[in-house]
From Swiss-Prot:
<dbReference type="Pfam" id="PF00104">
    <property type="entry name" value="Hormone_recep"/>
</dbReference>
<keyword id="KW-0158">Chromosome</keyword>
<keyword id="KW-0832">Ubl conjugation</keyword>
<feature type="DNA-binding region" description="Nuclear receptor">
    <location>
        <begin position="421"/>
        <end position="486"/>
    </location>
</feature>
<dbReference type="GO" id="GO:0005813">
    <property type="term" value="C:centrosome"/>
</dbReference>
<feature type="domain" description="NR LBD">
    <location>
        <begin position="524"/>
        <end position="758"/>
    </location>
</feature>
<feature type="modified residue" description="Phosphoserine">
    <location>
        <position position="113"/>
    </location>
</feature>
<feature type="modified residue" description="Omega-N-methylarginine">
    <location>
        <position position="23"/>
    </location>
</feature>
<dbReference type="GO" id="GO:0003700">
    <property type="term" value="F:DNA-binding transcription factor activity"/>
</dbReference>
<keyword id="KW-1017">Isopeptide bond</keyword>
<keyword id="KW-0754">Steroid-binding</keyword>
<dbReference type="GO" id="GO:0008270">
    <property type="term" value="F:zinc ion binding"/>
</dbReference>
<keyword id="KW-0963">Cytoplasm</keyword>
<keyword id="KW-0446">Lipid-binding</keyword>
<feature type="modified residue" description="N6-acetyllysine">
    <location>
        <position position="494"/>
    </location>
</feature>
<dbReference type="GO" id="GO:0005819">
    <property type="term" value="C:spindle"/>
</dbReference>
<feature type="zinc finger region" description="NR C4-type">
    <location>
        <begin position="421"/>
        <end position="441"/>
    </location>
</feature>
């Protein structure tokens, strides 16, 4: 807004704030100043005007109003106080007031008359001001009640040349009466009420229709914070080092609050506090109608005054008002303790608008200060006649609801946490079968092992096993027991150790006089780590369903097509199983693919024989639970010869009474039973892995037979069966290749199985396969 605006009042304006043209009328700035002192001045001319040029860097002048009458000493420049107050409430420090009908003296000042009547009016106004703003002296506050009125001239030098030029231009447009209004005697210093007001060099006649008080609420880059507008009963928060929850101000700056809510700063303060007002709803609201800008002087507002202020210093690094941070500058914290500035700088203060509560509103929340210099704790701030409420914020480290982490001594008294079962996460009852488990999982594992149950998962072998759902899927529960390392041999070993300890306890009691005799401790402890066989049990694929419709009449084509589709899904399951075998993925990727292409028929035929042996006593072929080839189906064309080879495997397993551990080791060895003639890319690693599982087969035999002379004989029989699988698989592959190449049979093959057969046909026709046999023919 331009500084040359008319001061001509409208008809609707309040007469108390209008400058009339008649001599002797009164100017009332009370409503405009909003809480400032009412200054009544008798005007000797028909119009009153004041203009001055002041830079943004001005010197603050301190004015002392004694409690008594006005003394005869040289009076300070009250016009600067009026100018500063007007700038404070209008949003800028350089307030421009001007009108076309205002008369300005030629000297650039308005002298105050020494008339007795005018002096009485001024004394009466000052007395009213002292009565309204006087408060009892704080015994711990050394600062006197004063008002910071004008900035320092060192920081804000005046430009008198601009002032004189402006006054010459204004002289021609103002009234003819150039007399000065005298309120003081000649021996008292005169001062200009509007001395600090700045006028631009433009014509004062511009924009005469606008109000001079509608100035742009913008701040010069060197100015202070924008003013805070207040209501008619506005008050400023009082900060004192002896009170709790006070606003944070600069060190050695101790603001006071009079009874009527006016702010009085100490004479040593160079800082103007932003105004905090209260609304009729009894809560504090900060109003900033202007633009908040960073100040170059890094002045900190609302910082607590305490002896240990040097911990923080006069400079702050960020600005945050009402929880809003600007991009660098000062930090302004309202109603928060100083510990949060140094310790919780990454957290913004939270201000909650809390209505008055009858029960909990006796005083403000106690803020616990911290610091190395015995920082004064923030105290209680009470205003007479006003409801006291909680500030709604405290540092996170000071909040009572935030509990500190328990110390080691407190945790020791509460006791150790309960031990959980490694299978279902229920409360463990002890170490069962070498693993910390509950009683339910202990009984389940014992029954599952001794009963030799062949559990099947209805899902994908990834069921959740916990306290509530542990009975839903016994297959996944049993798998999790094996993964945890449960083993029946651990219990037997534990009993042996316990028996040895009991036997040696009596001997040690008898020979307790001899310190050389000690309790015998076994040299070997039970193996609690899972073995390869237990891992093979865990990764064993589930039984797949063929989806065969038994209500439809059987045919060779339909059965063969269904078996091919089932075989394609079994090959996918075999690939996943092979990748889970310990050591197999260490081989080269090409070697892994080659071994799977050579052994896929071995794996499916041997698994078919195992299912037929366990479920049908080797009399039927159990391809799937919903597809069992009985003697009637074997009589179909092209079915009997192939079924005869498959029944051979089942019958041999039944004859030898192969255990589940032996079956798992033999199946793994069938995966490693055929290689190319040129060898594998990681042949040495392959030989090492194969030898490892041969030893595992020997361990499974020893586990079944014990330390007997028949172990080598059984090992011979089982390895002989493995060698015979090559002949069985060769016959099955020949028939499979024939049906794949003969399009007249119209037997469908899944995509993956067709790809494997296509890659395998040239290798078999060229004889590029080397059989790894245990025995020479």
């Amino acid at each position: 807004m331009d500084s040359k605006e008319s001061l001509t009042p409208g008809k609707e304006e309040n007469p108390s704030s209008v400058l009339t043209q008649e001599r002797g009328n009164v100017m009332d700035f009370s409503k405009i100043l909003r809480g400032g002192a009412t200054l009544k001045v008798s005007v000797s001319s028909t119009s009153l005007a004041a203009a001055s040029q002041s830079d943004s860097k001005q010197q603050r002048l301190l004015v002392d109003f004694p409690k008594g009458s006005v003394s005869n000493a040289q009076q300070p420049d009250l016009s600067k106080a009026v100018s500063l107050s007007m700038g404070l409430y209008m949003g800028e420090t350089e307030t421009k007031v001007m009108g076309n009908d205002l008369g300005f003296p030629q000297q650039g000042q308005i002298s105050l008359s020494s008339g007795e009547t005018d002096l009485q009016l001024l004394e009466e106004s000052i007395a009213n001001l002292n009565r309204s703003t006087s408060v009892p002296e704080n015994p711990k506050s050394s600062a006197s009640s004063s008002v910071s009125a004008a900035p320092k001239e060192k920081e804000f030098p005046k430009t008198h040349s601009d002032v004189s030029s402006e006054q010459q231009n204004l002289k021609g447009q103002t009234g003819t009466n150039g007399g000065n209004v005298k309120l003081y005697t000649a021996d008292q210093s005169t001062f200009d009420i509007l001395q600090d007001l700045e006028f631009s060099s433009g014509s004062p006649g511009k924009e005469t229709n606008q109000s001079p008080w509608r100035s742009d609420l913008l701040i010069d880059e060197n100015c202070l914070l924008s003013p805070l507008a207040g209501e008619e009963d506005s008050f400023l928060l009082e900060g004192n080092s002896n009170e709790d929850c006070k606003p944070l101000i600069l060190p050695d700056t101790k603001p006071k609050i009079k009874d009527n809510g006016d702010l009085v700063l100490s004479s040593s303060s160079n800082v103007t506090l932003p105004q905090v007002k209260t609304e009729k709803e009894d809560f504090i609201e900060l109003c900033t109608p202007g633009v908040i800008k960073q100040e170059k002087l890094s002045t900190v507002y609302c910082q607590a005054s305490f002896p240990g202020a040097n911990v923080i210093g006069n400079k702050m690094s960020a600005i945050s008002i009402h929880g809003v941070s600007t991009s660098g500058g000062q930090m302004y914290h309202y109603d928060m303790n100083t510990a949060s500035l140094s310790q919780q700088q990454d957290q913004k203060p939270i201000f909650n608008v809390i209505p008055p509560i009858p029960v909990g509103s006796e005083n403000w929340n106690r803020c616990q200060g911290s610091g190395d210099d015995n920082l004064t704790s923030l105290g209680t701030l009470n205003f007479p006649g006003r409801t006291v409420f909680s500030n709604g914020y405290s540092s996170p480290s000071m909040r009572p609801d935030v509990s500190s982490p328990p110390s080691s001594s407190s945790t020791a008294t509460t006791g150790p946490p309960p031990k959980l079962c490694l299978v279902c996460s229920d409360e463990a009852s002890g170490c069962h079968y070498g693993v910390l488990t509950c009683g339910s999982c202990k009984v389940f594992f014992k029954r599952a092992v001794e009963g030799q149950h062949n559990y099947l998962c209805a899902g994908r072998n990834d069921c959740i096993i916990d306290k509530i759902r542990r009975k839903n899927c016994p297959a996944c529960r049993y798998r999790k027991c094996l993964q945890a390392g449960m083993n029946l041999e651990a219990r037997k070993t534990k009993k042996k150790i316990k028996g040895i300890q009991q036997a040696t306890t009596g001997v040690s009691q008898e020979t307790s006089e001899n310190p050389a005799n000690k309790t015998i401790v076994p040299a070997t402890l039970p193996q609690l780590t899972p073995t390869l066989v237990s891992l093979l049990e865990v990764i064993e694929p589930e039984v797949l369903y063929a989806g065969y419709d038994s209500t439809v009449p059987d045919s060779t084509w339909r059965i063969m097509t269904t078996l091919n589709m089932l075989g394609g899904r079994q090959v996918i399951a075999a690939v996943k199983w092979a990748k889970a075998i310990p050591g197999f993925r260490n081989l080269h990727l090409d070697d892994q693919m080659t071994l799977l292409q050579y052994s896929w028929m071995f794996l499916m035929a041997f698994a078919l024989g195992w299912r037929s042996y366990r479920q049908a006593s080797s009399n039927l072929l159990c391809f799937a639970p919903d597809l069992i080839i009985n003697e009637q189906r074997m009589t179909l064309p092209c079915m009997y010869d192939q079924c005869k080879h498959m029944l051979y495997v089942s019958s041999e397993l039944h004859r030898l009474q192969v255990s589940y551990e032996e079956y798992l080791c033999m199946k793994t060895l069938l995966l490693l039973s055929s290689v190319p003639k040129d060898g594998l890319k990681s042949q040495e690693l392959f030989d090492e892995i194969r030898m490892t599982y041969i030893k595992e087969l020997g361990k499974a035999i020893v586990k079944r037979e014990g330390n007997s002379s028949q172990n080598w004989q059984r090992f011979y029989q089982l390895t002989k069966l493995l060698d015979s699988m090559h002949e069985v698989v060769e016959n099955l592959l020949n028939y499979c290749f024939q049906t794949f190449l003969d399009k007249t049979m119209s037997i469908e093959f899944p995509e993956m199985l067709a790809e494997i057969i296509t890659n395998q046909l040239p290798k078999y026709s060229n004889g590029n396969i080397k059989k790894l046999l245990f025995h020479q023919k």
